[in-house]
Amino acid sequence: MDYNKTLNLPKTDFPMKANLPVREPEILKKWEEMDIYRRVLEKNKGKEKYILHDGPPYANGDIHIGTAMNKVLKDIVVKYKTMRGYDSPYVPGWDTHGLPIEQQVIKILGVKRHEMNPVEFRKVCKDFAFSQIERQRQQFKRLGVRGDWEKPYLTLDPEYEAKQIEVFGEMAKRGYIYKGLKPVYWCPSCETALAEAEIEYFDETSDSIYVKFRVRDDLGKFKGIVEDLSNVYFVIWTTTTWTIPANLAIALNPEFDYSLTKFGDEVYIIAKDMIEEVRKETGLGDYEILATFKGKELEGMKAVHPIYNRDSIVVLGEHVTLDAGTGCVHTAPGHGEEDFLVGQEYGLEALNPIDEKGYFTDKAPGYEGLYYAEANKVIKEDLRKANALLAEKKITHSYPHCWRCKSPILFRATEQWFASVEGFREEALKAIKEVNWYPAWGEERITNMVRDRKDWCISRQRVWGVPIPIFYCENCGKPLINDETINAVKELFRQKGSDAWFEMSAEEILPEGIKCECGSTKFRKETDIMDVWFDSGSSHAAVLETHPDLKWPAELYLEGSDQHRGWFQSSLLTAVATRGKAPYKNVLTHGFVVDGEGRKMSKSLGNVVDPAEVIQEYGADVLRLWVVSADYTADMRTSPEILKQIAEVYRKIRNTARFLLGNLYDFDPDKDMLPYEELLEIDKWALYRLNRLVKQLTESFDKYEFYDFFHPVHNFCVVDMSSLYLDILKDRLYTYPAKSKERKAAQTTLYIILDTLVKLMAPVLAFTSEEIWWHMKHDRNNNFESVQLADWPQVKEEYDNPYIIEKWEKLFDIRKDISKALEIARSEKKIGHSLDAQVDIYPSSELYEFFKGFEDLQYVFIVSKVVLHDPQEVAPENAYVSEDYDLKITVTRAPGEKCERCWMYSETVGTIKEHPTICARCASHIEEQLKV
């Protein structure tokens, strides 16, 4: 007789080899055919809403590993919330305007911006943006991200632009929008102003120069200290040589001590506490302090500009520190925020001798036409000729750069439009406190940024963007903006999009009969566009308030930690300014993706991990599993080695699911399920461990701690299941009669475990959970077309059975000692497989009573025979001694012959005439099977 045919061996067509790169696209196609996004929304329609508002990625180029991580995290949130019964639509968006697209159009398409009119150039930009959106949309879908991909929100949509104009108009109406001449971050390469969020800091090598400004008027303060002023100088220090031509003042701190310090024949005015530092940096020799004054005593003195022989007045400023330099700060009001503010106090001109391309104008005689960076050498030579260059050297320091072109930027005073953050700063700080920040340090970070930030420069000198909806009177030059003009522009954009601004005249746009206060009816349009952060920062109004599936405020904004100064902040500012509160209730941030050694990814280092390549090699589910493999609130490491490890963990999880499926091939959950009371104790223990997993994942996911998925699920599958419960269960599943109560108890437990596990996996392992679901049989109340339509598992109180937990946890702990004893016997060649063994247990009285509470310990220990000795019996001298329990163990070869069917050794093998090669237990099972 072929006894193999009498065993209930696993059967499943669920493949062992995942082959995800091939299988996942097939699953995606099925999701599209069933319109899974709408199906999920219909299921939860009318229930409590949970809105995660998508921060729009920039429509430019392929997605990178950080973008992939961000989208997967969002998808996990939304899928979890829908399984918890929330109506949780996900409307993805794209940021479509701005400089990067202009640059790509010029670079890739070879477009010459200045040879095209704005309308033509904008059309090329729009077409490029749409091509990038389609490219990224397919990449996001390939990650398994579920969303309204056919109707995303785009910042270039006419409806969106109209709503953005409304936000701008409301801020203007409340007095928060103004035009002013101010030093702003300026990129000469891109020829535009930049917001703080568009600045990155990189190390830069610059000049470090000490410059002498001879005193022209000391207000009589130095009389009697020096004979005359011909050799008395204020000494300044700067790392921006090119700003010297724009110097109009020298700033001192009113409370610092400043010394007239004699070095040789010259007297230098330096902060007393910086004299030694200056001496060291300049190589000056011995000195003598002639006198010391408070900074405020020197206010109003005049020095001579070393190049132009004009006055450079001495002013006071609290911004002057002793961190570096001389305590005398070179002040060019047209080139620095603090310089500008001090200059305003003293009525100084915001002199800006540099044009939008970075070249000196005729306001800097002698340097006209020189690029600012190239002028450094000439300026230093002129200072040297004037005997004003005290010392120079090169230093490396952190310097602001344009985030797009990576060029160094400069501060440049120009006329710009600003949002006055000062007008609603306190409201914004209050709103921050009302939001839940994950991790908690995010609150302090954005609080500091908002508290310390300057007014927001919102104008850009480009054409691909939303125009600033302001008109100027051609007669008096006064700007025109009111409810009437804003409504006219808003409605125009709603109908025709913002291209209309560039296609129509002011007269065609403005309502008929509108006049300036001066009486003129002739107007021209503003030519600047809005900062792209104003675009995306208006999404709460343009999307949350207008989309029929969404609501304001959102439950969650989830982006990288750099967005505290970006989208989180621009959204907060526009919302507080117009609605008085934050547009979000919760904000979660993740770190950046770095390589396996914690280094930033870069092409030059060759350490870039491309998500497309990961998907091609391993599949999207392995990438998704990586996303939850570590605490993503810090920087996340990835590398080929790390991904290989993740793929191995995935394989183990998949194998566990395959084992469960394989042993449920003949199980019908509607007919074969047993009630909890009829399960064996070990089955109840397995359900306790499952229940613990449900509880842990639910609590963690509720707190957005999705990294708590990886290790618990891995441990449950590998340790609790594969290495323990499922290993023990094999005998009952394979050798017992197919319809026996014992086997049905095991299958009931396996079904509950699989049904629960596949649902727990669904938000993370989107494709694999679906593949498992489609291979499962389901009970009539659970027979959904997709696992995404199923409910999240509930914690079952009855599974937390204290008696079962305590008893079986202790036995499995003791089982570790049994395994150690078996391993020693194996190493001593006493046994091969554990089923070759007989285990003799010599326990204490207490443990003896404990062991008597179990039947068939041989199946738990996976040996052929267990002999429990009386506590009075003495164990052999060579017995294994447990370190944790009062227990000794011996291992010998089991008596009897090996059963051909169950592979256990038994003295009953050969005693059954009809079945001479199998044990009595197996013979009994076969006879029982034949009766069915």
Swiss-Prot record:
Chain sites annotated for binding ATP: 603
Class of enzymatic activity (EC top level): ligase
Purpose: Catalyzes the attachment of isoleucine to tRNA(Ile). As IleRS can inadvertently accommodate and process structurally similar amino acids such as valine, to avoid such errors it has two additional distinct tRNA(Ile)-dependent editing activities. One activity is designated as 'pretransfer' editing and involves the hydrolysis of activated Val-AMP. The other activity is designated 'posttransfer' editing and involves deacylation of mischarged Val-tRNA(Ile).
Keyword terms: Aminoacyl-tRNA synthetase, ATP-binding, Cytoplasm, Ligase, Metal-binding, Nucleotide-binding, Protein biosynthesis, Zinc
Binding site for Zn(2+): 899, 902, 919, 922
Subunit structure, as described in the record: Monomer.
Residues that, per the record, bind L-isoleucyl-5'-AMP: 559
CDD domains per UniProt: Anticodon_Ia_Ile_BEm (cd07960), IleRS_core (cd00818)
One Pfam family hit: zf-FPG_IleRS
Motif ('HIGH' region): 57-67
Cofactor note text: Binds 1 zinc ion per subunit.
Gene Ontology cellular component annotations, sorted alphabetically: cytosol
Gene3D superfamilies: 1.10.730.20, HUPs, Ile-tRNA synthetase CP2 domain-like
InterPro entries: aa-tRNA-synth_I_CS (IPR001412), aa-tRNA-synth_Ia (IPR002300), Anticodon_Ile_BEm (IPR033708), Ile-tRNA-ligase (IPR002301), Ile-tRNA-ligase_type1 (IPR023585), Ile-tRNA_ligase (IPR050081), M/V/L/I-tRNA-synth_anticd-bd (IPR013155), Rossmann-like_a/b/a_fold (IPR014729)
Catalytic activity, reaction form: tRNA(Ile) + L-isoleucine + ATP = L-isoleucyl-tRNA(Ile) + AMP + diphosphate
Residue ranges annotated as motif 'KMSKS' region: 600-604
Domain notes: IleRS has two distinct active sites: one for aminoacylation and one for editing. The misactivated valine is translocated from the active site to the editing site, which sterically excludes the correctly activated isoleucine. The single editing site contains two valyl binding pockets, one specific for each substrate (Val-AMP or Val-tRNA(Ile)).
GO annotation terms (biological process): isoleucyl-tRNA aminoacylation
Family note: Belongs to the class-I aminoacyl-tRNA synthetase family. IleS type 1 subfamily.
Gene that produces this protein: ileS
EC number: 6.1.1.5
Protein's name according to its UniProt entry: Isoleucine--tRNA ligase
Compartmental location: Cytoplasm
Requisite cofactors: Zn(2+)
GO molecular function: aminoacyl-tRNA deacylase activity; ATP binding; isoleucine-tRNA ligase activity; tRNA binding; zinc ion binding
